[in-house]
Amino acid sequence: MARALLIVLDSVGIGGAPDADRYGDAGSDTVGHIAEACAAGRGDRPGLRAGPLHLPNLAALGLGLACEGATGRVPPGLAPEGPVRALWGHAVETAAGKDTPSGHWEIAGVPVREAWGHFPDTQPAFPAELTAALVARAGLPGILGDCHASGTAIIEALGAEHVRTGKPICYTSADSVFQIAAHEEAFGLERLYETCRIAREVCDPYRVGRVIARPFLGSAAEGFRRTSHRKDFSVAPPAGTLLDGLETAGRAVVSVGKIGDIFAHRATGREIKPAGNAACLDAALDAFAGLPEGGFVFLNLVDFDTEHGHRRDVPGYAAELEAFDRRLPEIQAVLKPGDLCVITADHGNDPTWTGTEHTREQVPVLAFGPGLAPRALGRRESFADMGASVAAHLGLPPLGAGQAWW
């Protein structure tokens, strides 16, 4: 019986979606613009990386050709040097969003059909009733922020006041999120999580996709820094995801990274949540090596997005892509005959773009495994085609959305 590994390179988009203009993202292209910046010398950082973007293993799987399908051009340095060794294509999202839950749920076969609730870019950003309910139920002296903000910028601006007053920092973005930042020691990590659980309930009537705990440490004198103890409190997806199908069939499932949070811990099997892309990939490979027949490992690599995309850090993003590329041989080595690996993304986050938000982009679809004949998949009209294809590969009943490419 076959096994499958699905890897989401968080935010690694490959060109603006057909409707990107509706989001202010027409012309965005995460991978393409990083490659162009590196080719022009704008991706260099002493001690980190230099020169053109070097992704020989991803190029051999068809990444450059997937980019060409999405934008009409192969990014600098991403043309394959020999025959492509995977099925390759690009996918567009049917859900009206460019957020993590929408992307992942659609990949898993359940596109979001109703619009998420969003908070206006005003100050205050949150309805007074929401804030009052959170303050009362969580026993808070008040909140700070109450605005759209970059997470790293707002803790630098308000971290000292937060420590002094005990008021958590609450902020949002263009995504459907309510984020709460608090000092792990001064406020307490478990107290932050409990505050977020309350906020999750308070935000439900507003159809907010995620409440996110953003713990940090440090001081005004030495600077504040986020820790690895982020936790997402998501709305549960509609029934019928690939994960639900696997659970019903009694299959082994391992969720690595923030997959458990994204799917509200429903049908996510054994959850492993290390810190950082490298540790997450280590955990996924270890889990896959011992995975029984018919099993599934679902991996999210979030550092592309959080550490580099939102921070508009081209050299850092390029280095992260190159680090993943170097480890592709390890991924290929754990695949046995009959196994399938799919590499994709959930949205874009072009580090050359304006602002600090996600970008509405198409995503790569790279599928490979021993014995799989390489071919072009073309444009997939929904991210759900990936979930449908994995389900078919694993011998599960068809999902409610998506067309398998088999």
From Swiss-Prot:
Disulfide bonds: none annotated. Binds 2 manganese ions. Keywords: Cytoplasm, Isomerase, Manganese, Metal-binding. GO terms for biological process: 2-deoxyribose 1-phosphate catabolic process; 5-phosphoribose 1-diphosphate biosynthetic process; metabolic compound salvage; nucleotide metabolic process. The keyword Isomerase applies. Its main location: cytoplasm. It comes from the Bacteria. One of its GO terms (molecular function) is phosphopentomutase activity. This is Phosphopentomutase. It comes from Methylorubrum extorquens (strain PA1). The gene is deoB.
